[in-house]
Amino acid sequence: MNENMSFKELYAIVRHRFVLILLITIGVTLIMGFVQFKVISPTYQASTQVLVHESDGEENSNLSDIQRNLQYSSTFQSIMKSTALMEEVKAELHLSESASSLKGKVVTSSENESEIINVAVQDHDPAKAAEIANTLVNKFEKEVDERMNVQGVHILSEAKASESPMIKPARLRNMVMAFGAAVMGGITLAFFLHFLDDTCKSARQLSERTGLPCLGSVPDVHKGRNRGIKHFGE
């Protein structure tokens, strides 16, 4: 078979296997849609913010206070995700999951040169995610006050279930990716089946394989078109 195929020949292969490509695309897309909407439970995220600012009380110590609090930012985030604090949240809300599982739902972050700590909790229940986030920051406020004598913890915003967006799964993106992958997979399979077929489908292919010139060809006479043809001896 000639390795240098023209665009017309490639298009003919795709057109010949168009039904197969279409069925694969529809099937994969429908399966992905079923998995996205019926199998995978949606995950929601509730967020809150905490400002940690401890001052010495002196008028000229504002800059040094901020620099010190920025250095303590990672420490505060570690305390917020500590097992002991997770156990307190678990007991407060009467949760059945383990402290390590609860810790995996909590994501803390802090922007550069900022004393604000962002706290996000992910859960399949938006109301539960907001409840965990609010309970966690309240426990954190008491924890740093008792253990570190830091009274500059301020909760800037409470997490609300009604504002919790669904972050997982990204249904539209996954559906588009499944559609594209199905189309590419169907086209790949169409070419694979074509190249596995060793039969000659044209006089040119036969001439290329044998190296002999083609002197003539016999047209394909369909059954419905040979009614008016009289055979020899009739």
UniProtKB/Swiss-Prot annotation:
Transmembrane feature ranges: 20-40, 176-196
Pfam families noted in UniProt: Wzz
Keyword Transcription regulation: no
UniProt xrefs under InterPro entries: Bact_polysacc_biosynth/exp, LPS_length_determ_N_term
GO cellular component: plasma membrane
Lipid bilayer topology: Multi-pass membrane protein
Entry keywords, A to Z: Cell membrane, Membrane, Transmembrane, Transmembrane helix
Compartments it resides in: Cell membrane
GO MF annotation list: protein tyrosine kinase activity
Protein family according to the UniProt entry: Belongs to the CpsC/CapA family.
Protein name: Uncharacterized protein YveK
Record gene name: yveK
